[in-house]
Amino acid sequence: MNEKFEVTNIKLGVKNPNRANVFINHEFAFSLDLSQLVDFKIKLGSEFFKHDIEKFKHASDFGKLYQRMLEWTFVRPRSVREASDHLKIITARSKSDYVRTSQELKADVMERLISKGYLDDEKFAKYYVENRFTKKGISKKRLKLELFKKGVDNSIVDAVLNEGIRSDEEEIKKIIMKKRARYDDEKLISYLVRQGFDFELARNLVQASSETD
């Protein structure tokens, strides 16, 4: 006969009163959100089998990890790869063997973040293109390379860049305004090419700016 385990105490969290610490057979077992207690029908005196307890512990670890990741994504939009890498870092630091090693737990957290729309590479790419070096100036080529390094698919990057949010011509003009006093035409063109701009476009705009000086 399978052994049952009794819920002998439930205490509200001190740091987070919306979370409760659950004690099984007078020993701390796990913590859950209050809504999870209701969903799982956990109350004082409830009895559960071992597989139930394991399910609750998974839900507990999932809830804490998901909340941490959620708060992290609220700081600014993130790419799916950025989130996956960050998740690996914080789970590797966990004191829990289960959290450190469970691929299922990590996959569940990522799946929830994506399904709820908190991770969306297209939205991230648009945010990145709209906000990266807006005053300093940046080439489409460099934006594409940076987004590739963040794990965004090239098809998504191309689609976003083709929306015309940023144009190389306008970006070059920004850089010329900032760098003109320090560089002659040749050095300024070389600098622009190193930044990923087309040589012909850079040369034409630099020469045009010289004529108007």
How would you describe each model-predicted region?
Residues 1-213:
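An alpha-helical, amphipathic repeat domain used for nucleic-acid recognition
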